């Protein structure tokens, strides 16, 4: 019998459409191409409601957080999100402190929409700004300019309890001065959370086909150090690989991922992880919005499903938990995986000998070296079929 303690449960809702597909983006996002956005919104929202209606597992567990991601969720009206939040509230039960986040693109800002999002219960906004530099915005093919980014951020900070600003570094031909200017502009907005992502060239993207010149690994590391030092000086805590927060504004939804919590994925391509008394299982919805829409009415929206093996649980827990700079409590590993900590004794010893992790007061956490070489650290916990450490 699987006896893992049931973790917090979150809901992720995917809105797959955007105005323009950025050249670096490998997410499940699709440009509107001559389609009626309003009609598309209605059809897709009804499909999301249908999937929620057909979600009959663990409906008595409280919902820890809701996250509307994309794509560009801010293309949809407050009325659509109101329907979805109400359906989740009826189907499940919202935690008293439920964090409800919407991702927004500064190029799609509608003031009435922003006010409406707040009115329907959304209390956190994540703005995909990426840069305040006009040259870099054009290179990244963002649909907003610097002023639109500033206006959107100031409006969001005024309206919402918590606001995250997404920024990128190691951009094509980016200088240290340009990066410092981006950081300073972000700090002037006075948001309580900043996410900083290294630009990576992913397969199946425009940048992969036509690679721009980007800073090399050493130059990227220097830029990262500049970011971390500047944000720490400004009272931000670097709590996760790419995330900085102050005043207790860490993202509850993402922390649930990193702590190997459970989540239900609603919408095209959305993934789920669910713990039960028998097992931990993962499943995902069909990725193509068109195919997803055609299958929802048949209650056939699940593409694949699998039960996590012991090796899966070990690697997936560590892959998530070691992203958090404060690491994890030993008893959390045991609660979330239903495995004794001795299951990974050999791997922990190897990681300690390489000075990639340390154990302090019952917590296992990555060292500064481990944070810098996270991929190498995670490889230690990736086993082959014979349970041998790779």
Regions found by a protein language model. Give the residues of each.
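Short amphipathic alpha-helical interaction segments
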Residues: 338-350
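C-terminal scaffold of the Radical SAM
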Residues: 6-8, 29-55, 61-339, 389
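Local cysteine-cluster metal-coordination motifs and their immediate loop/turn environment
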Residues: 16-29
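Short, amphipathic alpha-helical interaction segments positioned at domain boundaries
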Residues: 371-390
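A short, conserved structural fragment
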Residues: 353-362
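Short, Lys/Arg-rich nucleic-acid/phosphate-binding segment
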Residues: 244, 361-364
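Basic, amphipathic "hinge/linker" alpha-helix immediately C-terminal to the N-terminal HTH DNA-binding motif
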Residues: 364-371
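Short active-site neighborhood of thiol/selenol oxidoreductases, capturing the structured segment around
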Residues: 11-15
């Amino acid at each position: 019998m699987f006896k893992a303690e049931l973790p917090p449960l979150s809901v992720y809702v995917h809105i797959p459409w955007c105005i323009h597909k950025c050249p670096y983006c490998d997410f499940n996002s699709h440009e509107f191409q001559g389609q009626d956005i309003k009609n598309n919104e209605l059809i897709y929202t009804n499909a999301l409601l249908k999937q929620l209606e057909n979600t009959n597992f663990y409906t008595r567990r409280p919902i820890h957080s809701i996250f509307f991601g994309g794509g560009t969720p801010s293309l949809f009206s407050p009325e659509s999100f109101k329907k979805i939040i109400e359906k989740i509230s009826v189907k499940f039960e919202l935690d008293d402190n439920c964090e409800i986040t919407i991702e927004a693109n500064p190029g799609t800002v509608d003031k009435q929409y922003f006010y409406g999002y707040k009115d329907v219960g959304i209390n956190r906004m994540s703005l995909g700004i990426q840069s305040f530099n006009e040259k870099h915005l054009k290179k990244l093919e963002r649909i907003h300019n610097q002023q639109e980014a500033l206006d959107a951020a100031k409006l969001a900070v005024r309206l919402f309890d918590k606001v995250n600003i997404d920024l990128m570094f190691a951009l094509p031909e980016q200088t240290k001065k340009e990066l410092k200017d981006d950081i300073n502009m972000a700090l002037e907005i006075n948001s309580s959370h900043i996410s900083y992502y290294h630009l990576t060239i992913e397969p199946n993207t425009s940048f992969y086909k036509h690679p721009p010149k980007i800073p090399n690994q050493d130059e990227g590391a220097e830029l990262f150090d500049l970011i971390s030092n500047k944000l720490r000086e400004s009272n931000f805590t670097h709590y996760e690989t790419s995330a900085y927060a102050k005043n207790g504004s860490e993202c509850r939804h993402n922390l649930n991922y990193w702590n190997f919590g459970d989540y239900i994925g609603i919408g095209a391509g959305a993934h789920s992880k669910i713990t039960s008394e028998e097992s931990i299982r993962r499943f995902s919805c069909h990725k193509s919005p068109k195919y997803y829409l055609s299958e929802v009415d048949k209650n056939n929206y699940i593409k694949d499903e699998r039960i996590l093996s012991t090796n899966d649980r070990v690697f997936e827990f560590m892959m998530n938990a070691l992203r958090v700079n404060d690491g994890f409590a030993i008893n959390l590993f045991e609660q979330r995986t239903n495995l004794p900590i001795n299951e990974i004794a050999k791997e922990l010893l190897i990681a300690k000998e390489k000075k990639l992790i340390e154990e302090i007061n019952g917590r296992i956490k990555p060292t500064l070296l481990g944070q810098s070489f996270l991929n190498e650290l995670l490889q230690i916990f990736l086993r082959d079929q014979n349970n041998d450490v790779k």
